[in-house]
């Protein structure tokens, strides 16, 4: 007998039981959350983070429409300050995670979460919180693209990366602000020091961009990062590391999604035969702000790059 054929009382009992189970599960998950971070900014409830992410997606949708009949903003100085500010923030996070984990005697193979108020554990939790905040700040990458009318840079990879990182790391900080979580954040913040250094230098314009030949290796570095993440997480599962298994499996699935997306980007950008360029050059799908130039802005004369007209958006 199906649910629709059941007595009304039976249906209500099923619905009531399901609702009660959901409420109990919600209360249970909240009861095992990290007490150290519960009163930190943005951590009392998921709604501020979800609201910020929703506003971000609305801007991704409405921003290009608003800019359609407007001139792109000239943001060279803003981009230089922003990118090098992100270099400093990510270096701070990397340093705090490295020093905190070193002083706490963390293992890079397997490390459970210590929810105590030990000074090094709190230092690691705070650094991870700053890492989470940095992912919210990175929403500005997209804002700057749209204000500069670089809409071709706002790809699915770009939006997927930014929106999911900020949202999912709220979960990470709420329940596992320490232990194995330090490894991925430490590695990623170090890579972002390199990335934002590149973007900050590139924002100065064509006179320095010609020396930044290593752009393609940023994507390769990110691909290596995701493979290392999968290997490290798989090793933790193999050794039965006392860290939440659901987070291990979720991290593996998340890293695999990035491998496919970044590999697709890398092949399309660097491996496929180049088509005659009629617009803007390909850029890193994540946060290549301050770098792109249209072909009409740069011409090759006697082997040297020269400006041909005023560049917009830089």
From Swiss-Prot:
Di-lysine motif, short sequence motif: residues: 310-314
Pathway: Lipid metabolism; fatty acid biosynthesis
Regions of compositional bias (Basic and acidic residues) in chain numbering: 293-304
Residue intervals passing through the bilayer: 42-62, 78-98, 127-147, 165-185, 188-208, 217-237, 247-267
Membrane topology note: Multi-pass membrane protein
Example of a GO MF term: fatty acid elongase activity
Locations listed in the record: Endoplasmic reticulum membrane
Entry superkingdom: Eukaryota
InterPro entries named in the record: ELO_CS, ELO_fam, ELOVL4
Pfam families: ELO (PF01151)
Segments of this protein annotated with the region Disordered: 274-314
Bias (Basic residues) ranges: 305-314
Coarse class of the protein's main subcellular location: endoplasmic reticulum
Assembly and oligomerization: Oligomer.
Protein name (record): Very long chain fatty acid elongase 4
Protein species of origin: Macaca fascicularis
Organism phylogeny: Eukaryota, Metazoa, Chordata, Craniata, Vertebrata
């Amino acid at each position: 007998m199906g649910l629709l054929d059941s007595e009304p009382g039976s249906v209500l009992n099923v619905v009531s039981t399901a609702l009660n189970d959901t409420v109990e599960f919600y209360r249970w998950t909240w009861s095992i959350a990290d007490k150290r971070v519960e009163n930190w900014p943005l951590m009392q409830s998921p709604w501020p983070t979800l609201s910020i992410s929703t506003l971000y997606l609305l801007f991704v949708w409405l921003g290009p429409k608003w800019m359609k009949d407007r001139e792109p903003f000239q943001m060279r100085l803003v981009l230089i300050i922003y990118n090098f500010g992100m270099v400093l923030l990510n270096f701070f996070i990397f340093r705090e995670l490295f020093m905190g984990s070193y002083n706490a005697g963390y293992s890079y193979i397997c490390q459970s979460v210590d929810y105590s108020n030990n000074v090094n554990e709190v230092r690691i939790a705070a650094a991870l919180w700053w890492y989470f905040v940095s992912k919210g700040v990175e929403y500005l990458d997209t804002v700057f693209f749209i204000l500069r009318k670089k809409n071709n840079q706002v790809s699915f990879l770009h939006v997927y990366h930014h929106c999911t990182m900020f949202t999912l790391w709220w979960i990470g900080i709420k329940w596992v602000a320490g232990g194995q979580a330090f490894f991925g954040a430490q590695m990623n913040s170090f890579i972002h020091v390199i990335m934002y250094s590149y973007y900050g230098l590139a924002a100065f314009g064509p006179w320095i961009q010609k020396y930044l030949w290593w752009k393609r290796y940023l994507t390769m570095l990110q691909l290596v990062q995701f493979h290392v993440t999968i290997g490290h997480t798989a090793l933790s599962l193999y050794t039965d590391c006392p860290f939440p298994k659901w987070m291990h499996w979720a991290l593996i699935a998340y890293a695999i999604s990035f491998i496919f997306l970044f590999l697709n980007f890398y092949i399309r950008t660097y491996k496929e035969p180049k088509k005659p360029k009629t617009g803007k050059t390909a850029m890193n799908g994540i946060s290549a702000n301050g770098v792109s130039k249209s072909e009409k802005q740069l011409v090759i004369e006697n082997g040297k790059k020269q400006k041909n007209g005023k560049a917009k958006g830089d």
